[in-house]
Amino acid sequence: KRLCSKHRGVRKVKKDVLFMCQFFYPEYISSALLPFQTAEALKDSGLSVDVLCGFPKEYIKDNSKVPLHETVDGINIYRKKYLQLSRSNFFGRIVNYFSFTFMMLMNILKCKKYKVIIVYTNPPILPLVTLLARKLFKCKIIFVTYDLYPEIAVNMNAISDKSFISRVMSKINKNLFREVSRVVSLSEDMKNYILNNRGVDAKKVSVIHNWATEELHF
């Protein structure tokens, strides 16, 4: 069934997929490369694919020639500038997380143009923006879990498992996993952990290894 909306008497067909992620092409880290490769695979399969991401700074040698908007291999990339501090300390990472998430929230109206939004766990609060988009625009959400929060933060001794932040993150993430349309995990072990600790229907969870970018598992 085609998802359409009316605007001044003209029926507009929604685009297929929007990627929402902090890092993307031309940045050279895995959390930028993997979404780019997935976007290319979806585009090659015949889907329309756009990207809403952060403007590159830390993981690129020179960003002076990087445009805010460009089309690469048929993929429309929209880059948004946000406050970026050094990621070498906890404070800088927190500022970056909230700054980028706030910028995505300010651009949430763009989400109404798409049938599906693919969102990643970096930063960990970013998926909340897509949940709001789901409620507002009835789009489907595919949640790609690179990391599990608050567990990863606790294991890195960034927060205590008894802390207020940990309890809030646990509550948010349990609801998040239930609300999204699909969950993508990177391994069978991660999938099993999600099923045992997030209360998710097994039918919603797929395993896609980092290197399995050629096949479409969604």
Q: Which role fits each region the language model picked out?
A:
Residues 9-76, 81:
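N-terminal subdomain of nucleotide-sugar transferases
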Residues 16, 115-116, 182:
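Structural motif
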Residues 22, 82-92, 137-171, 215:
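Acceptor-binding helix/loop patch of EC 2.4 sugar-transfer enzymes
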Residues 55, 189, 208-211:
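Carbohydrate-associated surface elements
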Residues 97-103, 116-152:
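An aromatic- and histidine-rich active-site surface loop
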Residues 110-114:
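Glycine-rich phosphate-binding loop signature in dinucleotide/nucleotide-binding domains
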Residues 128, 132-137, 163-183:
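Membrane-proximal helix-turn-helix segments that form the acceptor-binding/catalytic region
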Residues 195-196, 203-204, 212-218:
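Acidic anion/phosphate-binding donor-loop and adjacent secondary structure
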